[in-house]
From Swiss-Prot:
GO molecular function terms listed in the Swiss-Prot or TrEMBL record: metal ion binding; protein serine/threonine phosphatase activity
Native source species: Oryza sativa subsp. japonica (Rice)
Catalytic activity, reaction form: O-phospho-L-seryl-[protein] + H2O = L-seryl-[protein] + phosphate; O-phospho-L-threonyl-[protein] + H2O = L-threonyl-[protein] + phosphate
Protein name: Probable protein phosphatase 2C 45
Gene3D superfamilies membership: PPM-type phosphatase domain
Database matches in PROSITE patterns: PPM_1, PPM_2
């Protein structure tokens, strides 16, 4: 997606892994592959930490364009900024919004050579019995609640009425160049980086809060290498019967590849484990 550029070469081998939270309340798995591309711009992060005695889960998918530099920077810095935020527990939405914006500002100030490099982000933060999903760009987040596929993020595309209006109000334009693009260049309307288009391509995340209860089964974060060829409902159906989230992530990746996805493919699956112990998720 986005700009075309030479990026990190890869041997084409998929990677996968996973883990379990210390409190046994959630497990996670990931799978990532360059797919049919010769280079890799996707990055992901899976982290379990502790803040004020609470077990915290942090998960993210970052799909770069114009190179891998911004996606790698966001992977390395976004969650560190978030965990250090003084309102991380008391006002998690504000902390997430601030962390997105400060990470973007720091990158733009630190590397003036990467004017046409950017990245999407789709992140999930587990705090107690709350799930916070935030995104910029088109790396989508889906939950399965009561067997139903529910999108908990909105793809930020330049042809959406509200996004196009925002861009034009800021003095920019949207035009068709194979797909709808900001300035005829970029296929997403919100992203990290993209210094030359920053006035129009903002990093304001949309944040959604969900309650972690017994109806919430699992979460999927993935780059558009999956969503270009697999529907939300298909992804949930494929994942629901696979208890091991790493195996579920691998299944999604393999299916996207089989369906001729032309992009890098990265999937993160988080499964919520509703045991017989404490009713809380801290």
């Amino acid at each position: 997606m986005g700009y075309l550029s030479s990026v990190i070469p890869t041997d084409g081998s998929p990677v996968s892994g996973g883990g379990l939270s210390q409190n046994g309340k959630f497990s996670y798995g990931y799978a990532s592959s360059p797919g049919k591309r010769a280079s890799m711009e996707d990055f992901y992060e899976t982290r379990i930490d502790s803040v004020d005695g609470q077990i915290i889960g942090l998960f993210g998918v970052f799909d770069g364009h114009g190179g891998a530099k911004v996606a790698e920077y966001v992977k390395q810095n976004l969650f560190s900024h978030l965990l250090r935020h003084p309102k991380f527990i008391s006002d998690t939405k504000v902390a997430i919004d601030d962390a997105y914006k400060s990470t973007d500002s720091e990158f733009l100030e630190s590397d003036s050579s990467q004017n046409q490099c950017g990245s999407t982000a789709s992140t999930a933060v587990l705090v107690g019995d709350r799930l916070f999903v935030a995104n910029v760009g088109d790396s989508r987040a889906i939950i399965c609640r009561g067997g139903n596929a529910i999108a908990v993020s909105k793809d930020h595309k330049p042809d959406q009425t509200d996004e196009r209006q925002r861009i034009e109000d800021a003095g920019g334009f949207v035009m068709w160049a194979g797909t709808w693009r900001v300035g005829g260049v970029l296929a997403v309307s919100r992203a990290f980086g993209d210094k030359l288009l920053k006035q129009y391509v903002v990093v304001d995340p949309e944040i959604r809060e969900e309650v972690i209860d017994h109806s919430l089964e699992f979460l999927i974060l993935a780059s558009d290498g999956l969503w270009d060829v697999v529907t939300n409902e298909e992804a949930v159906d494929m994942t629901r019967s696979i208890h091991d989230p790493e195996e579920a992530a691998k299944k999604l990746l393999q299916e996207a590849y089989k369906r001729e996805s032309s992009d890098n493919i990265t999937c993160v699956v988080v499964r919520f484990l509703h045991g017989q112990g404490s009713s809380g998720y801290a």
